[in-house]
UniProtKB/Swiss-Prot annotation:
InterPro entries: Ribosomal_uL10, Ribosomal_uL10-like_sf, Ribosomal_uL10_bac, Ribosomal_uL10_bac_type, Ribosomal_uL10_CS_bac. Belongs to the universal ribosomal protein uL10 family. It comes from Streptococcus equi subsp. zooepidemicus (strain MGCS10565). CDD domains: Ribosomal_L10. Part of the ribosomal stalk of the 50S ribosomal subunit. The N-terminus interacts with L11 and the large rRNA to form the base of the stalk. The C-terminus forms an elongated spine to which L12 dimers bind in a sequential fashion forming a multimeric L10(L12)X complex. GO terms for biological process: translation. Forms part of the ribosomal stalk, playing a central role in the interaction of the ribosome with GTP-bound translation factors. This is Large ribosomal subunit protein uL10. GO terms for molecular function: large ribosomal subunit rRNA binding; structural constituent of ribosome. The lineage of its organism: Bacteria, Bacillati, Bacillota, Bacilli, Lactobacillales. GO terms for cellular component: large ribosomal subunit. Keywords: Ribonucleoprotein, Ribosomal protein, RNA-binding, rRNA-binding. HAMAP family: Ribosomal_uL10 (MF_00362).
Amino acid sequence: MSEAIIAKKAEQVELIAEKMKAAVSIVVVDSRGLTVDQDTVLRRSLRESGVEFKVIKNSILTRAAEKAGLDELKDIFVGPSAVAFSNEDVIAPAKVINDFAKTAEALEIKGGAIEGVVSSKEEIQALAALPNREGMLSMLLSVLQAPVRNVAYAVKAVAESKEGAA
């Protein structure tokens, strides 16, 4: 192999390793068998969720995972591999891919990494079942508002009972 090709591949490894280090969530899939239309829809959905999606050679992924400290990911880089990276939302790649896999049976989740910890296919699917960040924040807000609401109802009930007694 020429030195130019080796240098280019080394640069790719560095770039992917940096993406892996920076990502809060990585999902690796086998997209073999998807139609062009399905692939386009999947990529659009991921892009709208702020997720980067790339098909990368396994040899480059393996070396990048080693450099990123995610050695255990090497076991899932068998067969065609596509990787979804998210730097902001932990749940977004898992949720979009898992929802899409329900309609496109050709898409198979292989595994991934969540905040630097290698995760199995089952863990990625469990993560996908969680609500997104906005959903979790609204749940937290409703839990925090409940005691205040209950106090307000109690004060209102006392005020109404005193009005009725007067």
